Amino acid sequence: MGVMEILVSTLEAVPGYRVAQVLGVVKGSTVRSKHLGKDLLAGLRTLVGGELPEYTEMLQEAREVAEARMLEEARRLGAHAVLGVRYATASVMQGAAEILVYGTAVRLEPAREV
């Protein structure tokens, strides 16, 4: 038996479906920091400007972990979708960031045409 696929959307509704049951807010978070050597390299890059790939990669990985944690919570509730998804980022300390992702877990059913 495969893992149930859960729709993740920033929308508040899914075209062709209606929300049959609101299961509540689900969230996932992680705090990440970079390796000291990579942090020093990124620090040097700030002197000349441009993208800091070390931090871009760190934040992308953190978003993926946070979203997976949110989806695990939604899966435990039996959700079909997580709607109104939002991401938040906060600096916790020098070189470390928290990523939080949250939304509303719902069960869906096909919309009835009138």
Curated annotation (Swiss-Prot):
Q: Name one Pfam family in it.
A: YbjQ_1
**UniProt cross-references to InterPro entries, sorted A to Z:** UPF0145_dom_sf, UPF0145_YbjQ-like
Query: What family is reported?
Result: Belongs to the UPF0145 family.
**PANTHER family hit by this protein:** UPF0145 PROTEIN SCO3412, UPF0145 PROTEIN YBJQ
| The protein's name | UPF0145 protein TTHA1944
- Source species, please? Thermus thermophilus (strain ATCC 27634 / DSM 579 / HB8)
